[in-house]
Amino acid sequence: MFQEYLRCQVCFREVFKNEHLCDECKSSLPFVKKGHYCKHCGRVTKIAGEYCDVCKNNLTAIDVGRSVFSYEGNGSRLVTLYKFHGRRYLKKFFAEEMYKIYIEDGIRDYSPDLIVYVPMTKRAERKRGFNQGLWLAEEFSKLTRIPISHSIVKVKETPHQVGLNRKQRLENLEGAFHLKSKKEFFGKTVIIVDDVTTTGATAEMVAEKLKSAGVKRVILMTIASVGYIKKEGDM
């Protein structure tokens, strides 16, 4: 049976060998340049080796962060197809690109113990029909052989975050996450796998919850990140 992913997901040309993108579109993806990311959250930066405005001006529970590409152009298109249109098969491409970073940028050297993903409330997951973060975590776990923890749950519905600054998002997320078990996290190095870093508020709240359980180090790995632009009210 002819499968949908045998056509490039950007330009719809026919592709071969079960590829999701043609060579031309893959080369056009805005991959994060070596070193051009915030050392803490992995957000793309213009100057190599600098911190983003958020991490420069705030204490953060995230110790190390990396993103595959910038959330723009064909990068944002692919994430949108995956996140909002359920193109599940893209998880393999995303996980493979994250795995390259895991090996080449030395994330493996931190000897991570567990992978977690950003949970959704049961109601939100039923409405969407899937959790794209879980899909990604499962695929990344296969490649790294790091087990997934399902102990983080979201217990509070939160208002739509689009258009809100970091401070407003953090306020919305207060009390939204709960750990079913703290023992499994104590002294561990944990990777948070997520789709997009925008203000970083969601990952920060998850990281804080992990640190409260005694996690030694939190690593954030995302498909894409938004080059941060300060909004009124941000710190």
Description of each model-found segment:
Residues 1-193, 198-235:
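Glycine-rich phosphate/pyrophosphate-handling loop used in enzymes and phosphotransfer proteins
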